Amino acid sequence: AGLKTVQAGETVLDIGSGGGIDCFEAARLVGPTGRVIGIDVTDTMLEIARKNATVVAMNLGYSASNVEFRKGLADAMPVDDGTIDLIISNCVINLAPDKRKVFREMYRVAKPGGRFTISDIVSDQTVPQYLVHDTQKWGDCLSGALTLTDYMKGMTAAGFLGIHLVKVSPWQVIDGLHFFSVTLTGYRLSQAPTASSARYATLRGPFSRLVDERGTTYRRGIPQPINPDDELLLNAPPFAEHFLLTTEPVTFDNHDPRWTAVLPAQAPCTWRGHYALLAGPFVEAADDDHHVYRRGEPLEICSKTVAVLETERYTPHFVILNRAGNRVSGEAVTCAPEGGCC
């Protein structure tokens, strides 16, 4: 997924490059003026990748290879500070003993204005010790899985912002723990200009309230003062589609076409074992049915809420899992007059 955003002339870093397949595709996308660096700890993989680099360059019509393979660990990368436009990785950080150190290394090597798009395995609950020390599960990228909450918190603590879900698919369920393959993107923001073109941000929806990674709260239809750093972040995807940025405060209500909302059906709901995990780029969000979602934390939801979160406006921000399987044959529940069912 990370390769879809590669721009010509960029410098791309692949953590855990193996035989170099992703690096060679990145080499084609960045063109002869770009660079690609692959990091791996395995001598055999490095040897294979280096042998193929010259052949790939020739096939691409380049006068010399623009790919370099270096031996190193993910938590101590042989890469200079602030030199990378895009960091990619595929199910490698999961295997690192200290993932937070890897996140800090990623931030160190990223350019201001750089980004990452990485795929990895995460879980919905903390992996218990008997699985952590299961050597087979470790090799299957399960024992080292962080919860989605801890993974995204670690990225934020390292300095990245705008961390959000690009893709998700179920991986395995073991002893009631749900493991997911996720692709996440985030940014090391560049220095904001001293002068801002926007001074206010008004949340359009579909959420009724949001809290961003800096702790700023936005309420739908109500202008919130912002600074140049806020503007820089809110102009990045996927924030931009949710906000109206203006030089003067703009207030609007549900009669305004800029207001967006997805309301639950006015009907009874059923409980079928579904849980929703907010997957960024916000740390907290509220919908129009009194649910408050916190990033990465499972919240049990009923069938009506599942239908809401599976709509086009909501689905990019959530992982939805079912802990009950096919064991539920629940009866419909009538929602409370003054609030939601769940």
Segments from the language model and where they lie:
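Short alpha-helix
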Residues: 144-158
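C-terminal lobe and adjacent flexible extensions of AdoMet/dcAdoMet transferase-like proteins
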Residues: 158, 164-169, 176-342
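Class I S-adenosylmethionine-dependent transferase superfamily signal
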Residues: 26, 91, 105-107, 155
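A short acidic, Gly/Pro-enriched loop at the edge of an enzyme's catalytic core
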Residues: 75-86
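Class I SAM-dependent methyltransferase SAM/SAH-binding core
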Residues: 11-76
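Short, glycine-/aromatic-enriched active-site segment of Class I SAM-dependent methyltransferases
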Residues: 122-142
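A short SAM/SAH-binding and catalytic strip from SAM-dependent methyltransferases
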Residues: 85-98
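A short glycine-rich, Lys/Arg-flanked "PGG" loop and its adjoining helix->strand segment in the class I
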Residues: 100-115
